[in-house]
């Protein structure tokens, strides 16, 4: 009598993890570049529940010096602030399938691990963006000095310039707009409605480009009623622990099957 042992079976951990790593690497490269460095996705081992860092707050400026004065000057002190990155654990799955479901379609069973590995990479990227937009909203909404109220429907592109005014003469440092698709299409609609001349199908539009020359990240994970104007490194999502993947046999059901699940942790740092 023959008995099947582990070496007779194939559990495709490597297939799934390879697909995950390849897909994530592509997403990281494209996303970091396409966001103008405003939203950074990174990998770094971080211990504990928080990453705390202190920084100096100075903001000094030049002042006129009276060359004929012998008066005393008043010393100024520097300040300090603290940035805290918070860990957020995530999970994926579990997903299961019978081997029969793939064999009956003439497909290799390892295809299950490949498609799941690619999907978990996409799911983690989308989840990272959800974490980023939630962190941005919490941080910015608590700072009334960085919030303006406007509407594309009534204010048009002035909605964006009102936000840029908050940066003063440093407005050029804005690297990226982040907005919901509904807000983006409101801007497109406003640009179309603002055409100043049309004849024989040729349209001339007045004013600046719809987003004032800044790239836009359009994601429906962003709040529908908020537009973020971000500086470089505005938010950093760090995969702070090695993600775990598990492919496993399902041996206690009518049909033999395999399953897959994953988990991981990210740190969220807001500028």
Please place each PLM-identified region on the residue numbering.
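Short acidic, glycine/tyrosine-flanked loop/strand segments centered on an H-E-D-like triad
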Residues: 78-106
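Alpha-helical scaffold segments that mediate packing/assembly in large oligomeric complexes
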Residues: 99-170
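Helix N-cap / beta->alpha transition motif
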Residues: 96-102, 178-183, 220, 229-231
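Extended, compositionally biased alpha-helical segments that mediate assembly or anchoring
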Residues: 2-8, 239-271
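Extended, solvent-exposed, turn-rich assembly/linker loops in the middle of proteins
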Residues: 138-214
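Extended serine/threonine-enriched, polar tracts that run as long, contiguous segments within proteins
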Residues: 202-234, 238-249
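N-terminal "assembly arms/tails" that initiate or stabilize quaternary assembly
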Residues: 1-86, 236, 242-243
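Short helix/loop capping segments that flank catalytic or ligand/cofactor-binding pockets
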Residues: 63-65, 186-189, 195-196, 238, ...
